[in-house]
């Protein structure tokens, strides 16, 4: 299943300033990983300096940059991505939103991007599973953090991530170069990259897995059949939305012994 074309189409639909804000709110509600990432950002922000610098490594639509910018207007935030179209859209939106030089987006490849000792927080949300040279990226992000800075990662786990549950299954998202990480694997790789304190927790337990199927997997499968299904989606979500919200909330506040996602925090 090709996921990127659907994402590009959605991003183009919500290009206007008001549309982009609505789009961010929808993403934050529907994507369970956003619930986890925003929770971790809030924890970090309680102890952050007023002039903290943040990097979103693989910024995509820019929803996490937008969230961080609303926590404090004094934070300096940079988003980087390999997709030039998204970089242009994000720069245009944030300039129109009055952020000036505090927020900027740049095209960059994480396998070569390094800004030594520049950031207090780096986000890497659903990115590493797309990159073969993952340890190299981890090393670059470690170098780019200030001492004591924190890296927050969201990625599929090896417990059914990318909808791969047994031998012979293929990834739901064909753009992934790996189906998911074992906790031991990603922690060892981060240790090799120079991080000194690493914490991992499972996301997408049973409630989250059901929510993901209802709110993401089935709609994406429909949209891959044809663009006409964009007309059906509002009615579909009208029914599914309350159920997905209850499931996401349940997943966020329950400790999982296993899950199809991982949230990892690593400190330099």
Feature locations, PLM:
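A short His-aromatic
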Residues: 126-130
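A short glycine-rich, Lys/Arg-flanked "PGG" loop and its adjoining helix->strand segment in the class I
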Residues: 136-147
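Conserved catalytic loop of SAM-dependent methyltransferase domains
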Residues: 199-236, 261
């Amino acid at each position: 299943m090709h996921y990127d074309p659907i994402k590009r189409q959605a991003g183009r639909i919500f290009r206007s300033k008001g549309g982009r804000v609505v789009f961010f709110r929808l993403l934050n509600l529907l994507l369970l990983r956003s619930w986890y990432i925003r929770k971790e950002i809030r924890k970090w922000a309680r102890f952050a300096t007023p002039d903290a610098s943040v990097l979103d490594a693989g910024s995509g639509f820019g929803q996490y940059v937008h969230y961080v910018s609303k926590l404090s207007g004094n934070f300096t935030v940079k988003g980087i991505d390999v997709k030039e179209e998204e970089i242009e859209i994000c720069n245009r939106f944030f300039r129109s939103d009055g952020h000036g030089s505090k927020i900027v987006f740049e095209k960059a490849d994480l396998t070569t991007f390094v800004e030594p000792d520049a950031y207090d927080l780096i986000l890497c949300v659903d990115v590493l599973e797309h990159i073969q040279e993952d340890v190299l990226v981890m090393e670059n992000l470690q170098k780019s953090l200030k001492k004591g800075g924190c890296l927050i990662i969201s990625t599929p786990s090896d417990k059914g991530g990318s909808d791969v549950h047994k031998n012979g299954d293929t990834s739901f998202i064909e753009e992934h170069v790996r189906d998911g990480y074992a906790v031991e694997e990603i922690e060892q790789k981060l240790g090799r990259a120079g991080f000194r304190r690493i914490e991992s927790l499972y996301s997408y337990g049973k409630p989250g897995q059901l929510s993901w199927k209802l709110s993401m997997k089935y709609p994406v499968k429909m949209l891959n059949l044809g663009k006409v299904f964009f007309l059906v989606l509002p009615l579909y979500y009208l029914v599914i939305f309350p159920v997905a919200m209850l499931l996401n909330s349940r997943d966020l506040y329950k400790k999982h012994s296993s899950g199809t996602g991982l949230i990892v925090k690593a400190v330099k």
